[in-house]
C-alpha cells in the first residue's frame, strides 16, 4: 500500500519534471511511465539535501518508544535502518528543531519492497530530546518507493489558530509505477499540529497530480488524447470553524491535447477549493464553478 494521501502547500511545491520538458504529459508517459515522470525531479532532492540531520537527532528519533494516541505507535529502532532523513530549525520557535526520518522494518529487504515507518519529531534544539512525535507506517510497492532524499519539511506559516502553527512534511516517491496509468500523484503533504507530546495529522493531500481525461496515452500515434497535470498549493483563509482557520487549496492545471499533424496544444487554468476543519481534520466544503478535477 502507498503512503497516506496528502495536502497542498506554501511555498510552492516541487514541479513535476513533465512540466519542465518539451514533451506533453501524454507523450512523456509513453517514454518514462507516469510514476517515473512525477518521481524523477531533482528539485525536490536538492531541497532535501540541504537539510541533513546530525547524528544526535537521528539517534534521538530512533530511540523513541511510544504507544497509542494520535501520534501513532513507535518502538525504538536501530539507527542503521535509516532510509531517508531531513532536519531543519523551526522558525516559529528557535528552541525547537524538526526532524523527519524514515526507517526500514529490517535490514535485508530490497528497496521497493520494504515496510517503512516515518517519524516526524520536534526536538529540543539544545538537548536533542524528542518533545513531540508522529509515527506513520508506509509500505513500498510498484507505485511507491523512498530514496535517501525523499523527505522534506515544510515550515511555511500554517497558522491555524492563535498560537497554533502546523508543521508540514512532504514525502516524494521515486517509484516508476505502471507505464500507462489513468491517474498518478506524488509529493504527499501531511500537516501536523502539536498536542502535548504528540503530533496529530489534520490535513493530507498530494501536491503533484496527473490524470488521463480522454483517449489512450500509450497509443503513440493516437490523436485526441487529453491529459491533465497539476501542482497544488495551500494558503490560509480568513474564516474560522471549529477553532481553526479555513485553508484554500489552489490547483494550477495544464491540459494537453494531441492534435493530428500539428503541435500538441496546452491550456492552463486554475481551480480553487476551500477546506474546513471539522474538529478532527480538514475536509472540502466548496468548489469552483467547474468541478474540482482531482476528487477530494
Roles of regions detected by a PLM:
Residues 1-25:
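N-terminal secretory signal peptides that target proteins for export/translocation
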Residues 27-39:
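Bacterial N-terminal signal peptides
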Residues 42-76, 181-296:
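Acidic, small-residue rich beta-repeat scaffolds with periodic aromatic anchors
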Residues 47-115:
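Solvent-exposed N-terminal domain segments of exported/luminal and surface proteins
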Residues 81, 138-153, 211-215, 292-294:
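Repeat-based blade/solenoid architectures
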Residues 83-94, 149-162, 233-242:
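Structural signature of eukaryotic scaffold interfaces centered on beta-propeller domains
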Residues 94-104, 160-173, 241-252:
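Acidic/hydrophobic-patterned starts of short beta strands in beta-sheet-rich repeat architectures
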Residues 98-162:
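Short N-terminal edge-element motif at the start of the domain
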Amino acid at each position: 500500500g502507498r503512503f497516506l494521501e496528502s495536502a497542498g502547500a506554501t511555498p510552492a511545491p516541487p514541479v513535476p519534471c513533465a512540466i519542465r520538458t518539451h514533451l506533453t504529459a501524454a507523450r512523456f508517459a509513453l517514454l518514462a511511465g507516469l510514476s517515473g515522470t512525477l518521481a524523477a525531479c531533482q528539485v525536490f532532492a536538492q531541497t532535501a539535501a540541504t537539510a541533513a540531520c546530525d547524528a544526535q537527532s537521528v539517534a534521538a528519533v530512533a530511540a523513541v518508544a511510544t504507544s497509542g494516541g494520535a501520534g501513532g505507535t513507535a518502538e525504538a529502532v536501530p539507527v542503521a535502518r535509516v532510509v531517508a532523513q531531513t532536519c531543519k530549525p523551526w522558525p516559529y520557535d528557535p528552541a525547537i528543531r524538526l526532524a523527519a526520518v524514515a526507517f526500514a522494518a529490517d535490514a535485508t529487504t530490497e528497496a521497493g519492497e520494504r515496510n517503512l515507518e516515518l517519524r516526524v519529531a520536534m526536538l529540543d534544539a539544545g538537548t536533542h530530546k524528542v518533545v513531540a512525535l508522529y509515527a506513520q507506517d508506509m509500505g513500498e510497492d510498484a507505485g511507491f518507493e523512498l530514496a535517501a532524499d525523499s523527505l522534506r519539511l515544510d515550515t511555511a506559516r500554517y497558522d491555524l489558530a492563535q498560537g497554533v502553527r502546523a508543521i508540514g512534511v512532504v514525502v516524494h516517491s521515486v517509484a516508476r509505477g505502471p507505464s500507462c496509468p489513468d491517474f498518478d500523484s506524488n509529493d504527499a503533504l501531511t500537516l501536523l499540529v502539536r498536542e502535548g507530546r504528540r503530533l496529530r495529522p489534520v490535513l493530507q493531500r498530494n501536491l503533484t497530480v496527473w490524470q488521463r481525461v480522454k483517449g489512450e496515452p500509450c497509443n503513440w500515434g493516437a490523436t485526441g488524447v487529453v491529459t491533465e497535470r497539476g501542482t497544488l498549493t495551500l494558503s490560509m483563509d480568513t474564516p474560522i470553524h471549529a477553532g481553526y482557520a479555513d485553508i484554500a487549496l489552489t490547483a494550477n492545471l495544464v491540459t494537453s491535447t494531441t492534435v493530428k499533424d500539428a503541435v500538441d496544444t496546452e491550456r492552463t487554468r486554475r481551480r480553487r477549493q476551500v477546506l474546513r476543519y471539522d474538529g478532527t481534520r480538514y475536509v472540502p466544503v466548496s468548489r469552483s464553478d467547474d468541478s474540482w478535477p482531482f476528487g477530494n
